[in-house]
Amino acid sequence: MSLGPVMLDLEGTALTETERRLLTHPRAGGVILFTRNFESLGQLTELLREIHALRTPRLLVAVDHEGGRVQRFREGFTRLPAAARFGEQYDRNHARGRELARMAGWLMAAELRAVGVDFSFAPVLDLAHGVSGVIGDRAFHRNPEVVADLAHHYMSGMQHAGMAAVGKHFPGHGGVREDSHLALPVDRRTPADLYTDILPFERMVRFGLAGIMPAHVVYERCDPLPAGFSSYWLRGELRDRLGFEGVIFSDDLSMAGAECMGDYPDRARAALKAGCDMVLVCNHPEQAARVLDALDDEPDPVSIARLARMHGRKGMTWGELTDSDEWQKARAVINALDDSPLMELDV
């Protein structure tokens, strides 16, 4: 059974029979984990083992584990700083900022790979315009060249640990005040003005970025649809103009920014038709079941091949990782850097 185009979430710290049934549906392809799914390192490792044993090829397992306000797993994991901390270090010393970003990318990815997570939806490529509260210090910097530089080094660290990177939120969520979890933001800037926000994505595509997540934001001077449902953005700009050949993941279809596209099956069909390879349905298992049953078309073979490249590689066991000099050095350096509050931001 090949990977399907739907990524689902779980209710708790162990699989229920209903979840087992949903995850073996031919249209299921992945699982996204949240803080509610984490109790301890041992529990998480066992949960991942169960998920991986459900089918072949194994389901993708993802998490939002950026650091700062967005870090799903806590006890036992390194407390990671917000991306803005690397931008601050970069402003003082470019080389140190780059090295810290690379080290944090490796540390985040190595710890997740050690428990069986395939990838994190990171790094954030949005610009720190000082407008968006939901982005805020999740962005590396206000300068697109600096964002691209730091994100490149962060991604290289992830890759060294055996993890593919997913940049978000194309073509840029940093220029709107509204939070797309709560409303449908509208960006009224001209295409020329948006170029600065797109630049980090363009650079990262050239550097070999494996995945991209579009924003549930309308860029009204370009297209009337939110970017995650827009063939203008996903096929015209991202695939054709930027030459992106990796995976396009929708943002969560349960967000308010997706409601304009109809019911959940309609949202999923619209996102896939526009160019997404996989759609996320979170916090509404009954709607996830509807989406799975509503997608009649066979998965796109090209999308299946893209998704297969998102599986993690080279994972060490937790003991092997924490015994390594590289982990001990990276953890000490990153712990000394971090001063951000750790809280759950529902993104």
Curated annotation (Swiss-Prot):
Plays a role in peptidoglycan recycling by cleaving the terminal beta-1,4-linked N-acetylglucosamine (GlcNAc) from peptide-linked peptidoglycan fragments, giving rise to free GlcNAc, anhydro-N-acetylmuramic acid and anhydro-N-acetylmuramic acid-linked peptides. Substrate binds at D64, R72, R138, K168, H169. The keyword Cell cycle applies. Its main location: cytoplasm. This is Beta-hexosaminidase. One of its GO terms (molecular function) is beta-N-acetylhexosaminidase activity. The active site is at H181 (proton donor/acceptor), D251 (nucleophile). GO terms for biological process: carbohydrate metabolic process; cell division; cell wall organization; peptidoglycan biosynthetic process; peptidoglycan turnover; regulation of cell shape. Belongs to the glycosyl hydrolase 3 family. NagZ subfamily. Pathway: Cell wall biogenesis; peptidoglycan recycling. InterPro entries: Beta_hexosaminidase_bac, Glyco_hydro_3_N, Glyco_hydro_3_N_sf, Glycoside_hydrolase_SF, NagZ_Beta-hexosaminidase. Its EC number is 3.2.1.52. It catalyses: Hydrolysis of terminal non-reducing N-acetyl-D-hexosamine residues in N-acetyl-beta-D-hexosaminides. The record marks D179 as: Important for catalytic activity. The lineage of its organism: Bacteria, Pseudomonadati, Pseudomonadota, Gammaproteobacteria, Chromatiales. Keywords: Cell cycle, Cell division, Cell shape, Cell wall biogenesis/degradation, Cytoplasm, Glycosidase, Hydrolase, Peptidoglycan synthesis. GO terms for cellular component: cytoplasm.
